[in-house]
């Protein structure tokens, strides 16, 4: 169909799968004696395309993840001793988790807190951010987080889906 429609260039906007498939298609056509140029624009929430500093979609995903967590962390006002784990995409790359944590901290800085209603900054803050690029000493973290739980009645964790897998 590409040949019939005289398509000789494809512009892709997407992540690994989109651009890998377009490149494979171009390679297949090249092996058949046909030319296809692929121009790929990276769009990935992982923000892990080198040398691109900021991929389309990454900052928006971080901002939306922060807003989502702002709604979820409100559960800390409903009862005591809450553990909230906000799992964020990022099997091999922690950029989105770290970016989401950063955006959430910006939101947190604009809040007013009422400690009498369990709305202290300590209860809404992030107590741990785990990403694949950093080793986790689980025994130390358990002790540290238990102390936070005892002091603040809650622990809030941002977890990249690939963290601690090694």
Language-model segments: residues:
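An alpha-helix initiation/capping motif
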Residues: 19-20, 39
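A cross-family phosphate/adenosyl-ligand binding-site feature
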Residues: 1-9, 13, 37-46, 162-166
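Acidic side chains
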Residues: 8, 16, 46-48, 63, ...
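Accessory alpha-helical/coil subdomains and C-terminal extensions
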Residues: 12-13, 22-24, 28-35, 55-166
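Gly-rich Lys/Arg/Thr-decorated short loops/hinges at beta-loop-alpha junctions or inter-strand turns
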Residues: 43-53, 81
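Short acidic/polar capping segments at secondary-structure boundaries
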Residues: 16-18, 43-46, 90-93
């Amino acid at each position: 169909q590409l040949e019939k429609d005289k398509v000789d260039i494809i512009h892709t906007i997407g992540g690994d799968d989109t651009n890998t498939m377009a490149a494979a298609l171009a390679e297949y056509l090249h092996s058949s004696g046909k030319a296809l140029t692929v121009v790929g624009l990276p769009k990935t929430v992982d923000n892990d395309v080198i040398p691109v500093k900021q991929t389309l979609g990454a900052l928006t995903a971080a901002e939306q993840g922060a807003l989502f967590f702002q709604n979820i962390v409100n559960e800390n006002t409903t009862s005591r001793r809450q553990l909230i784990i906000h799992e964020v995409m990022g099997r091999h790359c922690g950029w989105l988790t770290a970016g989401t944590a950063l955006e959430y901290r910006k939101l947190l800085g604009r809040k007013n807190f009422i400690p009498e209603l369990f709305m202290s900054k300590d209860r809404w803050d992030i107590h741990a951010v785990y990403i694949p690029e950093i080793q986790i000493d689980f025994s130390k973290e358990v002790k540290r987080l238990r102390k936070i739980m005892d002091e603040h009645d809650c622990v809030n964790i941002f977890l990249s889906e690939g963290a601690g897998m090694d």
